[in-house]
Amino acid sequence: MKPAKQTTASLAFLAMGIVYGDIGTSPLYAFKEVFFSHHPLAINPDNVLGILSLVFWAFVLIVSIKYLLLVTRADQNGEGGILTLSAIAQQNAPKPWRRIAMLLGILATGFFFGEAVITPAMSVLSAVEGIAVAQPDLAPYVLPIAMMIIVALFAVQAMGTERIGRFFAPVMLLWFLVLALLGAHAIWHAPQVLRALNPAYAVHFVLLHGQHTLFILGLVVLSVTGVEALYADMGHFGIKPIRIAWFALVMPSLLLNYFGQGAYLLTLSAPTGSTFFSLAPKAWLWPLILLATFATVIASQAVISGIFSLARQAINYGYLPPMKIAHTSEHSQGQIYVPAANMLLFVAVIFVMLRFRSSANLAAAYGIAVTAIMMISSLLLVLVARYQWQWRWPRVVTIGIAFIGMDTLLLASTSTKLMEGGWLPLLLGCVVFIVMYIWQQQRQRLLEIAGNELSVSAMIQSLEEESFQRAAGTAVYLSRSLNHVPRSLLHNIKYNKTLHERNVLMTFQYEAVPRVHPCRRAEIEQVSASFWQVVIHIGYQEEPDMAQVMHCCGLKGLYLHPNETLFLLSSERLKVQKLGMWHDLKVWFFIQMSKHALRTSERLNIPPDRLIEMGVYREM
C-alpha cells in the first residue's frame, strides 16, 4: 500500500506544475480587475465580501463539483479533453445528436485556441507589470520584457521541455505556498473577510447591483480561467492525484490569497492598484516578481503543450489536415512539438500583446472563450449523462438546468465586454472552427466518393482470374477504407500491367480511444491467394509509424520484410466542379489545405527508396 500512496502523492505533486499553472496565476490579475479596471467597483465591505463570496462559490460549483466530480467521470481509458467528451457524447446518442456533439467539440476546440492566444500574453504581462510597482520609472519597459520572454518561450519548444519540466512542480509548489502565506498574513489583520464564505454575501451582492452584476461576473470568471486543464490533462496524471492536488493545496492557497487581497482592500484607506504585489513586504517584492514570472511562464507552457496535444487529437479524428509532429522526448509520448501550431500561436500572441499592451486591456478579451467552452462542456455532459451513463431524464434535466443555467449567466456576463476586446478570442475560435469544419466535411465527402467506386471483393476476384506478370516481393497499397479500391492499385495494373506475388490493401482506422493495445493494433484477413486486407487501429494520442505497423503485422503472421516490400501510394490532385460560390469556396479552401498538408509517406515514415507515388486527378 505504501508504494501506491507514494505514487499518488508524486503524481499530485507533478500535477501542480502542469494542470494548475493557468488557474494558479489568476490571483495576479483577477481581483485587481474588479476594483481597478476601466470600470472599477467601489471599495467597501459589501462589495469586497460579495466578490470574495462569488469567487469562493465559483471554485466550489464550477471547479470542484462540475469539473472534478462530474465532467472527469467521462473518460476514454483515463484520457480527457473536450474532443474526448465530444467523442463519448457521439457514441450512443441518436444520429442527429451525434452531428451536434461533433460540431460542439470542433467549436470548443476553436475557442480553446482563442483562449490559448490570450493566456500567455495575459499571464506574462501581469507578472512583469510587478516591475512598475517596484520601480515606477521602469513601466515603459514592461511590454518589451514580456515580449522577450514570450519569444524565448516559443523558441525553445522545438528542443522540448523535458529537462526544465522537472522544475515546474517545485516552482509551482513554492508559488502556491507563497500565495497562501501572503494571503494568511493579510487575513490575520482583517479576519472579517472570512465571513464571505457565507453564500448570503454573494446573494446580497447580486441583489445590491442588479443588472450591473452581469458586468462584474465577467471579471469574477477570471478566477477560474484554466479550469478545462483539469479535464484535459487527466490522462497524464489520473483523476485522483488531480483531485488531491486541488483540495489539499491549490484551492486553499488560491482562496487564502484572494481573501488576503480582500483584507488588504479593507484595511488600507488608499490601496494601490496592484492588490497582489501589495500583499508583499518591500523586501520581498523583487523575489516575488521573479517567482511570478516563472509561474506565468509555466502556465503559458502548459497552454502551449495543450494546443500541441489538441492538434494531434484533431488530426487523428480527421478534423485537421496532417501536420508534422515531432517527439521531443524518448521517455514520454506526450512530449510533442507541432511546428505549424507553434508558429501560428506565436504570431497570434505577439499580435495580441502589441494590440492590447497591458493586462488591464487584455482582461476584457479574456474570459469569453473560457465561458463558451464551459457552456459546450455542459451541453456535452448532458448528452453523455443521458445516452452513455443511462441516467434517467429527471436527473439529467436537473444537472442540465443547474450547469447550463450557470454557464449561460457567465457567458452573458463576459459578453458585456464583447466590443472592448472579447471579439478577439471569438473571432479566432470561429476561424479555427471554419477550418476544421471544412476539412472534416470535405474529407468525409472524399470517403463517400471512394465508397461509391469499385467493389473491393469483385476487383480482387477479377484480378486473380487475370494472368498478370508477377513481380517478386510484396506491394502495400494504402486505401481510405475497407470498401475502397486504392487508385494506386488501379494505375499500377493499367500502366505497368503487373502484380506482386503478395498484395496488401492497408487501411488506417483512427479509434475514439487514446491508445490501442498492441495485440489489437492489426487486423489481418487473407481474401484470396495473393491478396490480404489489413486494418491498422490507431488511438488519437498516437502517431502512426510504418516500422511499428510492419512489426505488428509480423506478430499476426503477415511478414513484411523491409527490403522486399514496396509501398504504392496515390497522390491526389483535386479539381473543383462548379456548383455554386459557397461550395466552390469550400472545395478550393480544402484543396489548398490538402496541398500544404503533410504527405502520407512522411507521416508514416515510409523509406523513400521503398516508395512509389502515382498522381491521380479527382473532381469534387
Swiss-Prot record:
Residue ranges of the TM segments: 11-31, 51-71, 100-120, 138-158, 167-187, 202-222, 246-266, 288-308, 334-354, 364-384, 396-416, 418-438
Domain of life, source organism: Bacteria
UniProt name for this protein: Probable potassium transport system protein Kup
The principal location of this protein is membrane
Any Pfam family:
K_trans_C
UniProt keywords, alphabetically: Cell inner membrane, Cell membrane, Ion transport, Membrane, Potassium, Potassium transport, Symport, Transmembrane, Transmembrane helix, Transport
Entry keyword Transmembrane helix: yes
Entries under HAMAP family matching the protein: Kup (MF_01522)
- Spell out the InterPro entries in the cross-references: K+_transporter, K_trans_C, K_trans_N, Kup
Q: Which reactions appear under catalytic activity for this entry?
A: K(+)(in) + H(+)(in) = K(+)(out) + H(+)(out)
* Gene Ontology molecular function terms on file: potassium ion transmembrane transporter activity; symporter activity
- The answer to keyword Ion transport applying to this record is yes
Where would you find this protein in the cell? Cell inner membrane
The role this protein plays is: Transport of potassium into the cell. Likely operates as a K(+):H(+) symporter.
Family recorded in the similarity comment? Belongs to the HAK/KUP transporter (TC 2.A.72) family.
The record gives the membrane topology as: Multi-pass membrane protein
**Can you list the GO cellular component terms from the UniProt entry?**
plasma membrane
